[in-house]
Amino acid sequence: MNRTILVPIDISDSELTQRVISHVEEEAKIDDAEVHFLTVIPSLPYYASLGLAYSAELPAMDDLKAEAKSQLEEIIKKFKLPTDRVHVHVEEGSPKDRILELAKKIPAHMIIIASHRPDITTYLLGSNAAAVVRHAECSVLVVR
């Protein structure tokens, strides 16, 4: 049975993406792993919390997802992986929740996630990577 690797990608942070490329490529070589890339876009209530009106200022969620998928597919081209082993997922909502849900669904043998070095807000609020490490049912590689 082939291993399955989940790689959450923040499409707005190319520096983090650069950090995980070599790790994903090396892990994917083992057993010709299937690699599932995921990006998560905030749900519409998040935008409303910023004071933006739903209809007047925001594109439709389907348009946001299509644009996010296009950006993620461009990012994936940087990885040297067989295209028949790559899967693309775009979800809406809380990144940590969507990562954990997809990890269970596919099911993932490993999650490779990039993370910034902790700062004061991380200690107060927690990070997505920390939540994934705490709650994932598979191995998690955090790349800093």
Swiss-Prot record:
Q: Which domain of life is it from?
A: Bacteria
The protein's name is Universal stress protein F
Record-linked SUPFAM superfamilies: Adenine nucleotide alpha hydrolases-like
UniProt GO molecular function: ATP binding
Q: Which InterPro entries match?
A: Rossmann-like_a/b/a_fold, Universal_stress_UspA, UspA
| Species of provenance | Escherichia coli (strain K12)
Matching entries from Gene3D superfamilies are given as: HUPs
Q: Name one Pfam family in it.
A: Usp
What the record says about family reads: Belongs to the universal stress protein A family.
Any GO BP annotation: regulation of bacterial-type flagellum-dependent cell motility
Summarize the subunit comment.
Answer: Homodimer.
